Amino acid sequence: VATPEAPVYYLVSTAGFPNFGDELILRGWLRYLAAVVPHAEVWVDTHSPGPTALLVGDAHPRVRFTDTLWRLCWEAPSEDPWEVAAWVQHALRNPGMAPRWHQGIVLLGRVDVVHVIGGGYVNAIWPRHIGLLAAAAAAAEHAGGRAAMTGQGLSPASAGSAPLLVALAERFEVVEVRDAPSARLLDVPLGVDDAFLTLGHGVITPEQAWPDQPPPEVMLCLQSDLNELGTSNVAGAVLTMLRRWRVPPERVCVVEGIPRVDREVFALIEHELPGARFYPFADVWNRGLPLSAAQTWISTRFHLHMAAAAAGASGVAIAISRDYYRTKHQSLLDLGSGWTLVDDCADTAALPARPRAGGFDRHTVERLRKDKLQLAKAIYAPISRR
């Protein structure tokens, strides 16, 4: 049973694929909890508990990993968000409906906090994931604990799901979203992505990454997944910009946010960039992300945009999907990242000159980090059980 001396905290995450931003967010929350409540019993519910344990298992001394809520969402007999949300709540109240996860359901009965951490995995792209919000709300109610969601990107919402999302959010004690469409949907104040809690951790200088050669001038992170523009169009736009900017190929570096997925666009242009460097996800995670204000970035990925801009780097964000990635990148532009947004790679004549404006003002990054820390204190404040 949870006690004030050893509370039970249950984090719902999408880490473990891996995808740089998802692991960055989870590691940030675990490091925060390790600093303030190292004695707490911490559980992380994710679709890939084994890989997640290997990636972030050292971030808190008492963290353990499971996949109960994700399994329940997958087990629901429909893709319809309303039916998934209803089914997982029935299963939590009647574990016989999902006997393979009985022990995990029992565990949820003693949690102090159920925290659905960011970012953008509860939306129309993955309609079953709305069950995570429903399960978190139901579990907290059953246990007499607190439900929180932070840094959520709920856009684009599944058709017809808006009333359900609003109703579920009203059952959470703490609700924070990271973009304007999500804030309008729930009629809540606009917040920021959870990665602001931990930006700067896991960063190294380019000189540390490449001690024996000049550092790259231009960094690329180019994804092939969820890419409505097409990998060939993205490849063509990037190659065009590099040539117009007169960047020597040996001063270009490609960074992976998702292993292999972020190699495919580069594979189309690497023969035109002899000497370009490749920095795999394993190095990003194990050695650190090489960042400096002297760099220029071209990124399709949201969290690489955020991390590089927070280090003061200039950049171009390519919005590879209008309803999803454009919303994500726009949220950072609205905060002052200073980057240039491109959402039409086919019109090469309109591609921008090399940006020189820099990234976020450091005072902005520090203010957003402090705001997130205050939110963290509210989420993990002691629970008064009736």
Go through each PLM region and give its residues.
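Active-site anion-handling motifs in enzyme catalytic cores
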Residues: V1-R386
